[in-house]
Amino acid sequence: MAATRYNPKETEPKWRKRWDEAQAFRAVEAPGKRKYYVLEMFPYPSGRLHMGHVRNYALGDVIARYKRAQDFSVLHPMGWDAFGLPAENAAMERGVDPKAWTYDNIARMRAELKELGLSIDWSREFATCDVEYYGQQQALFLELFERGLVYRKESVVNWDPVDQTVLANEQVVDGKGWRSGAPVEKRKLAQWFLKITQYADQLVDDLKTLDRWPEKVRVMQENWIGRSKGARLRFRFAGQPPAGHEAGVEVYTTRPDTLFGASFVGVAPDHPLAQAVAAANPEAAAFIEKCRHGAVSEAEIETAEKEGFDTGLKVKHPFDPSWELPVWIANFILMDYGTGAIFGCPAHDQRDLDFARKYGLPVKPVVLPPEEAQAEAIVQKLLNEAYTGPGRIINSGFLDGLDVEAAKAAAIARIEEQGDGQGATVYRLRDWGVSRQRAWGCPIPVVHCQACGVVPVRRSDLPLTHPADIEFGKAGNALERHPTWKHTTCPGCGGPATRETDTLDTFVDSSWYFARFANPGAEAPIDKAAADYWLPVDQYIGGVEHAVLHLLYARFITKALADVGMLSVREPFAGLFTQGMVTHETYRKQSGEWVEPKEVEVTAEGKTRRARLVGSGEPVVIGDVEKMSKSKKNTVAPEEIFDVYGVDAARLFVLSDSPPERDAQWSTSGVQGAWRFVNRVWDEFDASEEPVPGTEEAVTGVATDNLRRQHAKTVKAVTEAIEGFRFNSAIAHLYSFLNVLKAERPQGRAGALAHAHRAALRDFALLIAPFTPHLAEECWARIGGQGLVVEAPWPTYDPALTQDAVKVLPVQVNGKRRGEISAPAGAEPAEVEQLVLADPEIKARLEGLTIRKIIVVKDRIVNIVAA
């Protein structure tokens, strides 16, 4: 038979059409059948796929195809996280309608995702900007509102005066808006919040049930929630207290054991006491204003230079009224953590130490490390670094001699006895601010009435949609500017009212979408029966950059919806996998301008690599390997790879290059290697011929036995590797087995070897299907496989064949290794003894000795006791 060349441009579309016609990936609720819900974090419709998308969705597709082959009822859906700022920016910059821009992008990306050959149930597709979706989200909002989980209050926010919107801390760079570059202002605005803090303990405690989540993600969430146990205590003023602060300064601390090491009390710039001081002191007011334009995120504040202002006020130490401490306003204290006030113990807190060194405040050690005998020994160490470890309390009166934990309890007991405070649990987690001053988002379904206050929209009036004639031509909230949309009547009294013009944070959109996929056409927000069948998501896949916010919000909303009876599960994602990024070398001209990889030719002479521009030959600087990004132009367009090598080669490369949790470095040589493998696979199947019927009982021979054993071992190894998310390892086993298939290819069509080879080829087609699905179908058809690979069961194997036929056993004489023998696997001790005594080398070692005992550990070792 003449060899045919594998042509992905013909093959891949053909099989995608066959899958569509067969509705091969439609999810079906099958009571009594095992279900499996695999979901990749849905994408923002930016307009084009990048290689990170290819890797992310290929990972999920491997799992979906594998589980389907194992006879699970599989749900593998796709949607679009479609609201958000980029669409409004496009509207302003290009004069396009954000809705049209978004749906055009969705159409392009949907076509690209379909080209990837993903086993997705497209009948469940939706975008969060679909009225059918965000209308149901508004119903959820009203449900939470009625349950007391939604409220509105004034809050200090980061305000971009150019874009005229609130910015998250992460969007403020060096005190400026990330997009506009304008200096950010601190403003008080009325904002909507969800009471996530009401679930703080559950969110921490339930992390221990998520044993299929990466430990690092669980730790990140635990730290973000920041549950800490300590004490609230009051420092009373020495002398006349400021008006309104007669009770003193309430401080929260996690280290009451270090109270005797206190050298100052600090308050946040936004603390009411700081505001009272600033009202009468222009210098204090100027310092506070400076703080407002400084670092905003906790991480930035942590690394920024510590600065303060001495208020001139003094407070009394709670354990010694004669001991007075100065009160400072400090830029590193957060108003929204604890009480917004601290006592500073420089010896045992690094921030306090940096502050004390700058302003000449005392540093008094009160915890002696276990390895130190004298307090004086640690004073020198405290010049630059605070001691925060365990130890024995010193210089602390009634606490002296106690260890740190015992001292904490004793200090809290004394504080409570004196009536100056009590033990307390505090969280870093704040309620979730969900207001956004943007029109391209989910409208918040409430109105403001002068007579009734805040009134929810009637459910019968949902969905509350955007006005058709909205204008996005300039910065700010287009809903606020609209001449008529915001004017309405109050659902309560029928009087005039105004609509809420803020929209919901897009994290709300992604906090429940996985539940909607259970039945996207349901009349209620969530079809509980369908959700009970499909949830939780068995395997969720996405980047670690979403470890905190998205995943935390989704966990919170799931618990809240369970409490209102909409869900039965309390955790949305049973398993979580965080994949690595796709990276590439960066290239720059001598001028510093970034250059795309396709414009560069790289040559190597020994270990020296040089790069030049294609065409001009201009030298190019080879930079670091970094995450693919448009800004550094080190991206590779997936369609360029698909056009040259086909989809399966691209999938194979991103899955085989490295373990999926690690970054994968893109290389042309790597994808070329994957393409060569695709062709080698096809060549093996193309060369195959149907064995002659009735010849399978012929003598097997060594080659046949070896092939059958390698076949069984490969099925076992690939299965275990997929189960363990070691996809690169699974592919490596397939590479090796292809070599075996080629080496053991029969010379004719008769005999056991021909039948064994044919059976191995059939299973090989099934084993490669999760990774290269189009190639698998073509190979399956080439050897006469019935139906589609996607409908075929996963291969099984005989465990006995995975054991080596022959075992090499070391032989010891009186405890020392003296040789080895080969014995059949599972051989009985008597048979092994005969082999040992017949071995010339062992016989020579035993010459002149009397054998007392031979001990055989089956398939492991032989011990001879001789004298």
From Swiss-Prot:
Protein name, please? Leucine--tRNA ligase
Regarding protein family, the annotation reads:
Belongs to the class-I aminoacyl-tRNA synthetase family.
GO BP term, example = leucyl-tRNA aminoacylation
Compartment annotation: Cytoplasm
Kindly state which keywords UniProt assigns to this record, in alphabetical order.
Answer: Aminoacyl-tRNA synthetase, ATP-binding, Cytoplasm, Ligase, Nucleotide-binding, Protein biosynthesis
> Where do we find the motif 'HIGH' region here?
43-53
Please name the source species.
Answer: Phenylobacterium zucineum (strain HLK1)
Origin, by domain of life?
A: Bacteria
